[in-house]
Amino acid sequence: MKEFYLTVEQIGDSIFERYIDSNGRERTREVEYKPSLFAHCPESQATKYFDIYGKPCTRKLFANMRDASQWIKRMEDIGLEALGMDDFKLAYLSDTYNYEIKYDHTKIRVANFDIEVTSPDGFPEPSQAKHPIDAITHYDSIDDRFYVFDLLNSPYGNVEEWSIEIAAKLQEQGGDEVPSEIIDKIIYMPFDNEKELLMEYLNFWQQKTPVILTGWNVESFDIPYVYNRIKNIFGESTAKRLSPHRKTRVKVIENMYGSREIITLFGISVLDYIDLYKKFSFTNQPSYSLDYISEFELNVGKLKYDGPISKLRESNHQRYISYNIIDVYRVLQIDAKRQFINLSLDMGYYAKIQIQSVFSPIKTWDAIIFNSLKEQNKVIPQGRSHPVQPYPGAFVKEPIPNRYKYVMSFDLTSLYPSIIRQVNISPETIAGTFKVAPLHDYINAVAERPSDVYSCSPNGMMYYKDRDGVVPTEITKVFNQRKEHKGYMLAAQRNGEIIKEALHNPNLSVDEPLDVDYRFDFSDEIKEKIKKLSAKSLNEMLFRAQRTEVAGMTAQINRKLLINSLYGALGNVWFRYYDLRNATAITTFGQMALQWIERKVNEYLNEVCGTEGEAFVLYGDTDSIYVSADKIIDKVGESKFRDTNHWVDFLDKFARERMEPAIDRGFREMCEYMNNKQHLMFMDREAIAGPPLGSKGIGGFWTGKKRYALNVWDMEGTRYAEPKLKIMGLETQKSSTPKAVQKALKECIRRMLQEGEESLQEYFKEFEKEFRQLNYISIASVSSANNIAKYDVGGFPGPKCPFHIRGILTYNRAIKGNIDAPQVVEGEKVYVLPLREGNPFGDKCIAWPSGTEITDLIKDDVLHWMDYTVLLEKTFIKPLEGFTSAAKLDYEKKASLFDMFDF
């Protein structure tokens, strides 16, 4: 096997690298790296190096990194450009690994850990680390073992050893229900004192030093607490042993929520899983506690316990250790589903960067472009900062709030990346500018063609067509990767639907799941075999298909994010290739493209349907248009269709054979009009939506921009056995909406779209009765605890105090002096409940940390005084009124004169 790096650090004048050698063994080396940089030279001078603008450059080799850095400063002082990669870690990786890196993830030691600290005086502050660490669970990916370090004797009480036998038992049998699949992987180590525990953990750490260190919120809590605790007990030099290079950096980060200490352990890549989840999951959650996210992702939360966590070790030490183990296991389970660690490795090795740099699109793209240009002997420009300036955003069409029975949507493939490639937008391809006409003149093709020579964008920018830009070239590579992974995702999705169909009539035989590659569409032979499988085998295959779909979805979405982040980087003042003109060219072209095709689609469908001036495009947003298909169905006659599948088939065929070619012709005209380098505006049919044939359902509705719901039968060629709701921007999607209300509103929408007004009214009556019986947490609204101090006047709300901040202040007064009650942390989410007048808390609401039960100290009073009427009105009825008003429906049956009679 070829060598590949694990971590790389610059310490002084040396590069310290951990790597896997050709024999598959982990090694460490210190390299006195000699970097190269570049300067412009006269055109008469012979050289093989040129900058991205074609200017000749001369290479300068330095004896060490210090000399190179000093040369850059001298060049800046005299106003000359020092070209080349000034991040010497990236330059070293490029020089050392001048080939595509094929890494073996089984050789990369990933540690997932969690510590427990008993603190009798509130939250244990990691920067102080004044309380003993009394439990550590550390999972090692290479060993596939959970190493548990347990402190038996501490200042806060002595405890008995944890029992693996009790841990394995069901809770009804007095056990902890630690899953059977990990019981045999647990290595339990009890210690009599903390010094012994920490020293043994440190020795273990050095023997099995992580390459990737993860866990839930480890960067903010676990890592600084362990580091500072070891420093407090043994001294700083001992704490630095956590770094394989004995080098650490302590950094205090200040933000609107206060300050926190970040410890960098040189030689270890920290990928805090809470940060991975926030960046890559594309979900907005009401709480990012591990318990909440576990419930959301796995349908199982953390291990439950009675009383405050600060008392758990003393009251139930057995549960305390099992709780610690399960916390680590939950993060492993989430990653098994989401694959964010593997995704980070893929991105990191593709770009040849430190793996933790995947959080920075600027760093990622800087490395990708540098490595590509280096192969061509092209030299990257010097990075400079620029003043921040705004530029236009995307176009969003204002919809008419209404119900829409039959709808088709069409989506431009990777709009901004495609614009960059079509127009050939790059810093070095700028050819000049032309006199700009109003944007609507370009949309309607009444303005003069901008240029017969150069590729143009309607913001006035012109680009060369006779050369490939650096940015379009690199984006094309990642674009092709995204297309590949999206193909895997959609194939797995289609395969999953085939398996679901077979599950309606499974075989009773005893068999095994088929060994197939779910990334590719099943052959006819496999489809026939699937029909003969048992339910057990089919369910196993469905599980694998869904995992493949999730892996493909994550990979393609994150490549999409990477691609689109390059567009954003072009407008980022810290990016090496920053140019405001280019960022503006991209978004302005996008605005024109969407409105151009709206005009073309309306013209085409008016011609097909024999109408005049009809606005068939009801909505558009950034890269998508939504087309009302009612008149298309009417043209054929709704009665002609046998069933729902029949009309979906018809619209599918109409979109594929008639509309997509018409759309393509329209975009080709635009490409010719703008004289672009190549035609890449490809718009495909996305959703086909409508009610079941013969039902009273409305099919879909819009309440405003970015707020709509559709009953979808087919998405990008994947036909659903049961329709799926596509809901955007409505309260069902908002993290502030209570969980139970989200579910109820979604059911209301389903009934509106699929069954109609009468069904909606029935459910409204049901939920109104059910609401008061629901668990208080499931109906509490959620808000972020921002700017508490701003509105805090002696513990009471000041002028213009927001409702949820008022609730936080109420809570703080109620728990004052009680250190066991969970504290509200600035910036975190809180649950909010309204209270009836006359309550003992003296205010109209109360709020406490989300993801937790309200403290027993005040729970009974809160539940007695909570205002169900206000809560139902604000969280459920008000948003439902918005839906039904737009859709011209009534959620409650209205009395009429006819109700007085029997007929």
Swiss-Prot record:
GO terms for molecular function: 3'-5' exonuclease activity; DNA binding; DNA-directed DNA polymerase activity; metal ion binding; nucleotide binding. It comes from Escherichia phage RB69 (Bacteriophage RB69). It catalyses: DNA(n) + a 2'-deoxyribonucleoside 5'-triphosphate = DNA(n+1) + diphosphate. The keyword Nuclease applies. This is DNA-directed DNA polymerase. Replicates the viral genomic DNA. This polymerase possesses two enzymatic activities: DNA synthesis (polymerase) and an exonucleolytic activity that degrades single-stranded DNA in the 3'- to 5'-direction for proofreading purpose. The record marks 621, 706 as: Optimization of metal coordination by the polymerase active site. The record marks 714 as: Essential for viral replication.
